[in-house]
Structures are given as C-alpha cells and as structure tokens.
Amino acid sequence: MLKQILSEMYIDPDLLAELSEEQKQILFFKMREEQIRRWKEREAAMERKESLPVKPRPKKENGKSVHWKLGADKEVWVWVMGEHHLDKPYDVLCNEIIAERARLKAEQEAEEPRKTHSEEFTNSLKTKSQYHDLQAPDNQQTKDIWKKVAEKEELEQGSRPAPTLEEEKIRSLSSSSRNIQQMLADSINRMKAYAFHQKKESMKKKQDEEINQIEEERTKQICKSWKEDSEWQASLRKSKAADEKRRSLAKQAREDYKRLSLGAQKGRGGERLQSPLRVPQKPERPPLPPKPQFLNSGAYPQKPLRNQGVVRTLSSSAQEDIIRWFKEEQLPLRAGYQKTSDTIAPWFHGILTLKKANELLLSTGMPGSFLIRVSERIKGYALSYLSEDGCKHFLIDASADAYSFLGVDQLQHATLADLVEYHKEEPITSLGKELLLYPCGQQDQLPDYLELFE
C-alpha cells in the first residue's frame, strides 16, 4: 500500500480520511523523502549524461544558476520556522503586525489635522510677510529722499561758488550721519528677518512634535482596542493553537520515525518480521471459528444475518473484493487469530464502519481499549483506540505479507497478534502514549467477522 502511494505520489481522499493526524504527518514525511530520492536520481542521471562528450553549448552572457545551501549533514539546509531559539514567538510577531497596522491607521487619521496645521501656518507666514513688505517701502522711500537731497546738493554746488572750509566740514558731517542712519536701518531689517526665520522654524518644529505625539497616542489607542477585541483574541488563540498543533505533530512524526527505526535495528524481543523461510510455502487453511450453539437448521435463516448496526458504505463488488482478499491472502497468514492458538482474537472484528467502531469503544468507557477491524475502504486493517481525548484510528498496512502502521514500514510484524503484543508495552506514538491494554470484543450474538470465514 505504502509502495503504491509513493510510486504514484498520490493518496486517495477516502484513504487519507482513514489516517490519524500522526500517520498523515509521517506519510507526508515519507512522500517528501521520496521526492528528494527521485530528485537525486535525476540529478545523478543528468551528471552522467553531462559527463559524456557532447557538443558544448554556447554559454549565455550573465548566465544565472541556483546552488543549494548545505547543512552540517551535507543535506539541503532547511530552516523550520519557530524551532530556532532566535525565532520570534508567534504572539510577538502578531503584536508587531498589529502595531504596524495601528501606526499606519493613525497616520491616515492624522493626515487631515496635519493639512489643517499646514494651512494655518502658511496663512500666518503670508500675514507676516505682508507686514514686512509694508515696512520695506518706508526704507526705500527714505533712501529715495536722501538720494534726491544729494542730487539737489550737487546741482547747488555746480551753481554756487566754491565752498569754504567750514561748509565742507558741515557737509561731511551731514553725509556721515546719513550713512550711520542707513546702516542702523539695514541692521534692524536683518535682525527682524532673522527673528522671523527663527520663529518660523520653532513654530514648525512645535507643530510637528504635537502631531507626532497625537499619532503615537492614537497608535497606542488603536493597538489596545484591537488587542481587547474579543473576535481578534479568538482568532489569535485559534491561529496559535493550530500553529502549535502543526509543530507538535511534525515533531512527533520525526520522533516516532526515529524511535521505530531504532526499534527495528535493535530487533526488540524477536518482534521483527520473521524470515520468509520460516513461513511455509503453502500453509494450511486454519479451522473456522465455532458457531454459536443456538444456530440450528430450524432457527438459521435462509440469508445469513448481518450486524444490523453496521452501515455499509461500499458497493457490493468492492466489499466482495475485500472479502476475497481476506480469504485468499490473509487467512494463510493467520490474520485475526490468537498468537498461540486457533481461536479468533477478542480484539478482531470484521468490516466495520468508523462510526460503529467508535460506538463499540465508547461503550466500554475504559481508556486503553482497542480493536482491529477490516477497513471498509481499502484492503487493509484499522486499529481503533480509545484514549482520554476520544477515539483514534491508525491504518495498518498489510500489502507486503506483513503488518505495520502506514508510513512507518521499518518495524514490521509477521502477524496482527505480534503487532498487538508489541504495542502492549511500546506506545504507538510518543505523544499519545497509546498502549493496547483492553481488547474490545464482540457485543452482538453473531460475530461481525462471520462473512470473512464462511
């Protein structure tokens, strides 16, 4: 079964529905391994092909290529988000995203007050510039008056006789006084312009500080309101829980894969698959289970009774194929029998639906109860287990004349009984700690596996 999935790189949705979350993660891990293996084969084939003498291709200018970064194990370097000590926790990332969104929203809200302040500031500048423009004509008028006076004096000098020494002294004194007044006026104008510029800068700086303070306060308010929002809190909790669940499942799948691989290497207690030489080539068909004593010719109906609680979801042809598969391939392997006797194991059941298996387990009310049923969807088995959190289901691969959980084919068992005995002491998964403690047997008068042994 696993080989077929990996060869096609496709799993039927009905089959995927039979898998537990742990088995799904392990299966995805195996499919990823198969992808890498195929990629390496293609790369090796390409290298062999390129090593042959061929006509060199003209290299393009500024040719680009991709080189994978390798880790310490010489494999492609992979960074698993959230597992490194430098990675930010999920809630910290959420807080940063909220803070950034709140800041952008506060900036948008502050855009209108910013425009209003800018217009007021521009109007005040225009008013003050008009005031200085009014002051400027007075200075110019003063200059014009002094200029006219100087021209008049020059004309008078031309018509007058040569001035005396005293007149020259008086003229020089008046000219120097005019120059001093002009210098004082220019200095006053420069001081006014500098003061106006300084006031302009201080006003602009003050307005910017006020707007920034308003933005910061608004950002904090928006961020606080979003964090206190019940819908956002619920969404955050769900996202965080889903992220933690995915991370734990992936980690658990890797741990289970390593644990079972190590168990297979150590060969724990002879539970590994026995050599095919020890299995007879043509084993004899085991005896049928004893029928109930009350079934006589008069009471036995013309049509065999079926478990009325089982709802058949498969077509008759598909169900017949599964029954034929069990009789032809599984009976020679003593599927469903006790390990040391020819009696049917109490945990073995026939073709049961998922709903019926859950009902049987819940009726016991004992965590650790389990049963193995023939799958209603595929040629294989499913182990149903009752834990503290509810019912779990694990698909068992029986495609290679051996039994192992789908996705972890390193540790295989010769019979279903061997698999059950092994997991009475060894948990199925490291996270769930599922130990097979209490077999869940038949509850109806007629066993649900009769059709498999008829």
From Swiss-Prot:
Renumbered residue ranges of the record's region Disordered: 45-65, 107-131, 152-177, 237-302
Tissue specificity field: Ubiquitously expressed. Aberrantly expressed in some cancers.
Keyword Transferase belongs to the record: no
Superkingdom, natural source: Eukaryota
Compositional bias segments (type: Basic and acidic residues): 107-120, 240-259
Keywords (A to Z) from UniProt: Cytoplasm, Phosphoprotein, SH2 domain
Example of a GO cellular component annotation carried by this entry: cytoplasm
Keyword hit for Phosphoprotein: yes
GO molecular function, one term: phosphatase binding
Modified sites of kind Phosphoserine: 118, 124, 261, 315
Ranges for domain SH2: 347-440
Subcellular location: Cytoplasm
InterPro entries: SH2 (IPR000980), SH2_dom_sf (IPR036860)
Spans through the membrane: none
Subunit structure: Interacts with ESR1.
Cited function: Inhibits estrogen-induced cell proliferation by competing with PLCG for binding to ESR1, blocking the effect of estrogen on PLCG and repressing estrogen-induced proliferation. May play a role in T-cell development and function.
Name listed for the protein in its UniProt record: SH2 domain-containing protein 4A
